[in-house]
UniProtKB/Swiss-Prot annotation:
Residues 284-305 are annotated as: Disordered. It comes from Pectobacterium atrosepticum (strain SCRI 1043 / ATCC BAA-672). The modification N5-methylglutamine is found at residue 235. This is Peptide chain release factor 1. Methylated by PrmC. Methylation increases the termination efficiency of RF1. Keywords: Cytoplasm, Methylation, Protein biosynthesis. The lineage of its organism: Bacteria, Pseudomonadati, Pseudomonadota, Gammaproteobacteria, Enterobacterales. One of its GO terms (molecular function) is translation release factor activity, codon specific.
Length: 360
C-alpha cells in the first residue's frame, strides 16, 4: 500500500481517538446536533480504523512468518502462512480503498421515492403498485419507515403515481441507483390468449434533506392550484378543495398532493417534495457539467433510461447497467433486493477507484 495512503489512515486513526474522547465531554453531550454529527463521524471512522488495525496486524504476522523461513522445521508452515497472509493483506487493502472513497453526504439520509406508471395502461399502473410494494417490503426488512406523501390510484389497481418518504439510516445510499426505467414482461390477468405484454414504470429517488439545505424558492415562482381529492377517503372525498398542485414556473416541475384531509398539510408535503426535486435537478446538472467520459451508473436522470427488466414467464430479472441476470424474480418482488442493489454499488465503487487511479 502506498505510504501516502498509510499516512492518511494513521491520521484517521488519531481522529477516531479524538472523536471518541469528544463524545464523552458534557458540553458535546448537551449539544444534540453536535453529538449526532460526531456520532456519525465516529461510526464511519470505526469501520476504517478496525480494518486498518487488521491490516497492521497482518503485516506484523507476515514479518514473523518471514523470520520463520530460516528454520528448516518451520519452513513449510511459514510458507503456507505467508501465502494466506498475502491474500488477507490484498483483501484488506481493497476494503480500505473502498472505505476511503469520497462519501456522498446524502448517502446517510432518507429519500423521496417516486414510482410512476409509464407505457402500458392499466398493466403499467398495476406494475407500479407491485414495485412500490417491493420497495416497501425492502424498507421493512431494513427497519426503515415509509410514509406515503401522495398517491394517484390506477383504475384497475396499482398506481398512476405514488410518492413516499422513506426514513432511516443509509436509505438514499442504498436506493439512489434505483432511479430510471423499469420494464415488465408478463401475461396480464385480463389476457385470454396468454400473450406476453410489455409495460414500463419509472422510478425517481431523491435525497430528503433538512429544510435549511433546500434551495430557496421564491413564492412568486410558484403557481398553486387547489382541487378536490379523488380516491379512497370515505365521505370527506370530493367535499372540499383539500388537494394541492404546485407548479414551479422556472423549471416546470409539478407536484401534487392529496393524501391528507388538510389543505395545509398537503401543501407542506408538496413543498418538501418540490424542494427535493429542484435540488436533485440542480445536483444532476452540476454532475453533468463535471462528468468525464466515464459511464455514470446513477444514470442520466432521464426517466426513459431503462435500467432493469422483470420477466415473469421466465422468473428472471436483469439489470442492464451491469449485465446482471438473476432467476429469483419471486424473491425480488417480495423485497429481497440486496442481490440486485449490492452489485451495482460495488460496480460504482470500482468505477470511482478507477477514476482515482487515473488522477494519480
Amino acid at each position: 500500500m502506498k505510504p501516502s495512503i498509510v499516512a492518511k489512515l494513521e491520521a484517521l486513526q488519531e481522529r477516531h481517538e479524538e472523536v471518541q474522547a469528544l463524545l464523552g465531554e458534557p458540553s458535546v453531550i448537551a449539544d444534540m446536533d453536535r453529538f449526532r454529527a460526531l456520532s456519525r463521524e465516529y461510526a464511519q471512522l470505526t469501520d476504517i480504523t478496525r480494518c486498518f488495525q487488521q491490516w497492521q496486524q497482518a503485516q506484523e504476522d507476515q514479518q514473523t512468518a518471514e523470520m520463520m523461513l530460516d528454520d528448516p522445521e518451520m519452513r513449510d508452515m511459514a510458507q503456507e502462512e505467508l501465502k494466506e497472509g498475502k491474500a488477507a493483506i490484498e483483501a484488506l487493502e481493497q476494503e480500505l480503498q473502498v472505505l476511503l472513497l469520497p462519501k456522498d453526504p446524502d448517502d446517510e439520509r432518507g429519500c423521496f421515492l417516486e414510482v410512476r406508471a409509464g407505457t402500458g395502461g392499466d398493466e403499467a399502473a398495476i406494475f407500479a403498485g407491485d414495485l412500490f410494494r417491493m420497495y416497501s417490503r425492502y424498507a421493512e426488512s431494513r427497519r426503515w419507515r415509509v410514509e406515503v406523501m401522495s398517491a394517484s390510484d390506477g383504475e384497475h389497481g396499482g398506481y398512476k403515481e405514488v410518492i413516499a418518504k422513506i426514513s432511516g439510516d443509509g436509505v438514499y445510499g442504498q436506493l439512489k441507483f434505483e432511479s430510471g426505467g423499469h420494464r415488465v414482461q408478463r401475461v396480464p390477468a385480463t389476457e385470454s390468449q396468454g400473450r406476453i405484454h410489455t409495460s414500463a414504470c419509472t422510478v425517481a429517488v431523491m435525497a430528503a434533506v433538512p429544510e435549511a439545505e433546500l434551495p430557496d424558492i421564491n413564492p412568486s415562482d410558484l403557481r398553486i392550484d387547489t382541487f378536490r381529492s379523488s380516491g379512497a377517503g370515505g365521505q370527506h372525498v370530493n367535499t372540499t378543495d383539500s388537494a394541492i398542485r404546485i407548479t414551479h414556473l422556472p423549471t416546470g416541475i409539478v407536484v401534487e398532493c392529496q393524501d391528507e384531509r388538510s389543505q395545509h398539510k398537503n401543501k407542506a408535503k408538496a413543498l418538501s417534495v418540490l424542494g427535493a426535486r429542484i435540488r436533485a435537478a440542480e445536483i444532476h446538472k452540476r454532475q453533468q457539467e463535471e462528468a468525464s467520459t466515464r459511464r455514470n451508473l446513477l444514470g442520466s436522470g432521464d426517466r426513459s433510461d431503462r435500467i432493469r427488466t422483470y420477466n415473469f414467464p421466465q422468473g428472471r430479472v436483469t439489470d442492464h447497467r451491469i449485465n446482471l441476470t438473476l432467476y429469483r424474480l419471486d424473491e425480488v418482488m417480495e423485497g429481497k433486493l440486496d442481490a440486485l442493489i449490492q452489485p451495482v454499488v460495488q460496480e460504482y465503487q470500482a468505477d470511482q477507484l478507477a477514476a482515482l487511479s487515473e488522477q494519480e
